[in-house]
Amino acid sequence: MQKAEKMQELRVFAQEIRVETLKTVGSLGFGHVPGAMSVIDALAVLYGEVMKVDPKNPHWEDRDWCVLSKGHAGPAMYATLGLKGFYPVEEAYTLNQPHTNFPSHTDRTKTPGVDLTTGSLGQGMSTATGAALGNKLDGRDNHVFVFVGDGECDEGQVWEAAQFAAHYKLDNLICFVDDNKYQLDGAVDKVMSHGKGIGAKFDAFGWNVIELQDGNDVEQIYDAVQLAYDTKGKP
């Protein structure tokens, strides 16, 4: 298949995820819509083209991992996994209801395909880093992808993990920073400015930083992941 055809398929997949995300949140009547919507194109690229996963065997040891450190984007992950066949997508319409397998924040003990329970911001980044190190020590040829919010980057734990990942040369770890400019209490720059930018901080720790002009463009996201794959010795 030509690249242009692949990209068009990913755009369609992203639109399908958007629709299902809105249905999922709508079933509850409220939820984290913007924080879910802002990661959908990246999820479409990962699950539509990039990641090694098996819906029939969610715990396959050689799978790629995807961690939502910003766990409140759970509805987007549920829509993505449902469309990939991990479960009937309509099951997610029980979002945050009693006895549901789809809490508002992702939970690996409840939802097939979810690799890590998240919600307390910063901890997903740290655990994803540990998973990447563990996979490397075990000799697995896989990657760990982690989504971190720009507001989440106020957490010191994010930067401890960033330093750790660079020190141990975890080139099997790829971090997406969802730089959507807003967090719960308002504009990110008003709550806690990151000086020269979040990318500059990761660069200072020794990461290979790739900044996109449009984080909702599936082709730019796909190309960035390929560049990250080609980088050796740096997360």
Q: Where are each of the predicted segments found?
A:
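Thiamine diphosphate
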Residues: 1-145, 211
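Glycine-rich ThDP/TPP pyrophosphate-binding loop and its adjacent helix/strand module
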Residues: 52-59, 63-65, 105-235
